[in-house]
Amino acid sequence: MKHLLKAGALVALACIVTLTAGAQAHAAKRINIRLAHPMAPGNNVTVGYEKFKELVAEKSNGRVRIQLFGNCMLGSDRVTMEAAQRGTLEMASSSSPNMANFSKQWMVFDLPYITSPEHQQKLYKAIDDGELGKKLDEIAASIGLKPIMYSEYGYRNFVTTKKPIKTADDLKNLKVRTTDSPIEVAVAAALGMAPTPISWGETYTALQQGTVDGEGNTFSLLNDAKHTEVLKYAIDSAHNYSMHLLMMNKAYYDSLPANVQQILTEAGREALTYQRSITSELEKKAEDAFIEQGITVTRLSPEERAKLVERTRPVWDKFKDDIPAELIKLVQETQQ
């Protein structure tokens, strides 16, 4: 009888150990990935990352969990991208202008009027499946990062808090907020403005307090971030195209199992397709919201737009030694 009791106890203990080990093994397989970005709730970039999180969970059956920290919760895009580069954060998202802090080659998209909305689909194809995308991946790898999504951001437009703007000349003498991108600063100067680099999280206060008179950004982001509360005038300058680059620390990515890497890249592509499909609609809704809130939006005439192109063209020559000619050519080929 005693032998039977001992045998039963051993079987029970074995079952407990097996179940505990199984639970521990399952827990060990779970992967938590933190993703930090500066964008406001409802913005197309934010919506894209929410879709990415959803797809990763679905494709991994809950094994991989993306934790989103938006709206500058963990710091500006520069701060969080530096953390991702160091490996103290798994993923971060930065606007393409701010990526100039990490490699000047990212400034190619900051060149004024290098791309146009009418050729957007060709640009997408080159980034997703062409030589341009391969080159961008190489640039990221050289600074210790792995691209997951070349997120759609959109075309930047100039807006002001006080001074009406309807022409290229109206931009002169404006104190304008810029990113740290040297090209963005140079573009503002070429148009006669006084450029003032300010982090995104501090821009609303700078506009409110009069530190700057205006800024350049997408209508959708400005509306989502409630900058419309202090803005009065806008023009559809569309002077440069920006992306929000979702990057992962490359060493961390390389350490992940191959099937998890595949889940992340597939989810990134699918989320990007979804994000691009809603961006135009969100931008149009934002422009309508501008008007509803009393902001005067001026559509530039072809003549005034030509003045902006002409006045900013010298910026290209100023930075020709910082951006490889091959990279500029790859972008220009998408505009033909």
From Swiss-Prot:
<comment type="pathway">
    <text>Organosulfur degradation; alkanesulfonate degradation.</text>
</comment>
<comment type="similarity">
    <text>Belongs to the bacterial solute-binding protein 7 family.</text>
</comment>
<protein>
    <recommendedName>
        <fullName>Isethionate-binding periplasmic protein DctP</fullName>
    </recommendedName>
</protein>
<dbReference type="Pfam" id="PF03480">
    <property type="entry name" value="DctP"/>
</dbReference>
<comment type="subunit">
    <text>The complex comprises the periplasmic solute receptor protein DctP, and the fused transmembrane protein DctMQ.</text>
</comment>
<dbReference type="InterPro" id="IPR038404">
    <property type="entry name" value="TRAP_DctP_sf"/>
</dbReference>
<keyword id="KW-0574">Periplasm</keyword>
<dbReference type="GO" id="GO:0055085">
    <property type="term" value="P:transmembrane transport"/>
</dbReference>
<keyword id="KW-0732">Signal</keyword>
<feature type="signal peptide">
    <location>
        <begin position="1"/>
        <end position="23"/>
    </location>
</feature>
<dbReference type="InterPro" id="IPR004682">
    <property type="entry name" value="TRAP_DctP"/>
</dbReference>
<dbReference type="GO" id="GO:0030288">
    <property type="term" value="C:outer membrane-bounded periplasmic space"/>
</dbReference>
<dbReference type="InterPro" id="IPR018389">
    <property type="entry name" value="DctP_fam"/>
</dbReference>
<comment type="function">
    <text>Part of the tripartite ATP-independent periplasmic (TRAP) transport system DctPQM involved in the uptake of isethionate (2-hydroxyethanesulfonate), which is then catabolized by enzymes encoded by adjacent genes in the locus. The DctP subunit is the solute-binding protein. Thereby is involved in an anaerobic respiration pathway that converts the sulfonate isethionate to ammonia, acetate and sulfide.</text>
</comment>
<keyword id="KW-0813">Transport</keyword>
<dbReference type="GO" id="GO:0046306">
    <property type="term" value="P:alkanesulfonate catabolic process"/>
</dbReference>
